[in-house]
Amino acid sequence: MSHDNKPTDSTPAASNFLRSIIDQDLAASTYAGRQDKAGEPLPTVITRFPPEPNGYLHIGHAKSICLNFGLARDYGGRCHLRFDDTNPVKEDTEYVDSIIDAVHWLGFSWDSEGKDGTRQPHLYYASDYFDQLYAFAETLIERGAAYIDSQTAEQIAASRGNFSEPGKPSPYRERSVEENLQLFRDMRAGKYADGEHVLRAKIDMTAPNIVMRDPVLYRIRHAHHHRTGDKWCIYPMYDFTHCISDALENITHSLCTLEFENNRPLYDWVLEHLRDSGVFRDPLPHQYEFARLNLTYAITSKRKLKQLVDEQRVDGWDDPRMPTLVGVRRRGYTPESIQLFCDRVGVAKADSWIDMSTLEGAVRDDLDGRAARGVAVLDPLKLIIDNYPEGQSEECSAPVHPKKPELGKRVFPLSRELWIEREDFNETPPKGYFRLFPGNKVRLKYGYVIECTGVDKDADGNVIAVHASYLPETKSGTPGADSVKVKGVIHWVSAAHAYEAEVRLYDRLFNDPNPDAGGKNFLDALNPDSKQVITAYLEPGLREAQPEDRFQFERHGYFVADRTDSQPGKPVFNRIVGLKDSWGK
């Protein structure tokens, strides 16, 4: 099992109670000495990531991916990727492909190395087990542990009771084994319509845990399956499939989010019945629950995310404002930054909210060490250096990365007319303003010291150009660079040489940290300024940026060449994150 990308940060991982559980199992040799069907020794730690292919993965799934693959890596085990594809109505190969791509992008592999050095893939589908699942369901029927219920879904729900009232047994609960087997086989043969019968476990209708009140194990669904086609018209439920798939794959530690805590007794019930029938042997897999990732200023409900897409409130599932992994990838987040974030938040037993600034902080910390630098003017104002020769230009240089001199320098031209940021000039500056204003001197970063000498205005009195003179002996990197002391430094690009680029300034999709809490309409919390498209002027070398190349635009933040809309020689840039958290103010 390989792990290609690892976080660059050396911060220790946050508390992870699951490591203590695994350590105890290793000390007790709980899963030692096992062999697969071929007689090969099995790892003592085998985990799995089991998504349902009914949508795009989001940042919450990244926590589970990093947890399952990370634990397997750290303990010398392996992690399986398994698609829980038991609901043909909602699933599609489009989602299968996107999930495979997302897990690979995060830096993980489900392959292991065989004894002959070959790669052994551990990519599985629950649908591959349909024949076995059906046979195991018949085993439960034969043991008197499952029965066919002919009530409607509404009747079953009503008879299940609630936390204060026990459930009521189905009138079909005492059908004979023979009748149940025949009905189940007729269900498989397609003799009944959807909803006409279900297979239920026969457990305890008075159990305090409502999950254990004769849960449904199989239902009829005449629908085309993305892998098995029309072979099946009955499909197993998640609770039946999940535990059996784990056992078939020799999973040791089955890690789920907290909403499945009440399902753990059913997980154990199914496996123990099949063990007692001789299907499985001890040690059985064990389910453990951890807190899901709840991120402020975001929603992760597939239904609500789909609503945003369907109503065109965002530009698709990979919109850089979306919390989907295809979205954050297009936004410019790196796999390493997401891993770093997951390491920092750790694994807990109780649900909590993680502030978006924690994720953005991990992104900044990762990009600070890897992103090349560049200059961009986002809100341009013309600066004319009147005493600089017309038609002439000269080279200025700056480090590609200030902390990595081995990367060398980048070179860009300075000429008579430049673009500067509009906010770097103020005709009537407030106290403490050290940038450009009439009579003041500032340094053009990597260039000369200049003095503002005047302005041009339009008919409405708006400043449309600033005039200045430069001090020829003050160029950065020359002996005279420090001969004139100034307090202000501004960035710039040559007007004649700059790359005129489309830049998309992305921000948080919601203004409210909890957009759908407490009965709110999450659409009311949409941030109208979450996307601004501007024309900016960039240093000319940025024209050669390739899709997914990341940069720090000095003084502005981190940006990425869009992986979808960039063209050769014409990259489009997305803002990944600012240089500091502006939402914490």
Swiss-Prot record:
A motif ('KMSKS' region) lies at residues 299-303. This is Glutamine--tRNA ligase. Belongs to the class-I aminoacyl-tRNA synthetase family. A motif ('HIGH' region) lies at residues 51-61. It comes from the Bacteria. Its EC number is 6.1.1.18. It catalyses: tRNA(Gln) + L-glutamine + ATP = L-glutaminyl-tRNA(Gln) + AMP + diphosphate. SUPFAM superfamilies: Nucleotidylyl transferase (SSF52374), Ribosomal protein L25-like (SSF50715). The keyword Ligase applies. ATP binds at residues 52-54, 58-64, 257, 292-293. InterPro entries: aa-tRNA-synth_I_CS (IPR001412), Gln-tRNA-synth (IPR004514), Gln/Glu-tRNA_Ligase (IPR050132), Gln_tRNA_ligase_bac (IPR022861), Glu/Gln-tRNA-synth (IPR000924), Glu/Gln-tRNA-synth_Ib_cat-dom (IPR020058), Glu/Gln-tRNA-synth_Ib_codon-bd (IPR020059), Rbsml_bL25/Gln-tRNA_synth_N (IPR020056). L-glutamine binds at residues 84, 238. GO terms for biological process: glutaminyl-tRNA aminoacylation; glutamyl-tRNA aminoacylation. PROSITE patterns: AA_TRNA_LIGASE_I. It is found in: Cytoplasm. The lineage of its organism: Bacteria, Pseudomonadati, Pseudomonadota, Betaproteobacteria, Burkholderiales. GO terms for molecular function: ATP binding; glutamine-tRNA ligase activity. One of its GO terms (cellular component) is cytosol. Pfam families: tRNA-synt_1c, tRNA-synt_1c_C, tRNA-synt_1c_C2. It comes from Cupriavidus necator (strain ATCC 17699 / DSM 428 / KCTC 22496 / NCIMB 10442 / H16 / Stanier 337). Monomer. Keywords: Aminoacyl-tRNA synthetase, ATP-binding, Cytoplasm, Ligase, Nucleotide-binding, Protein biosynthesis.
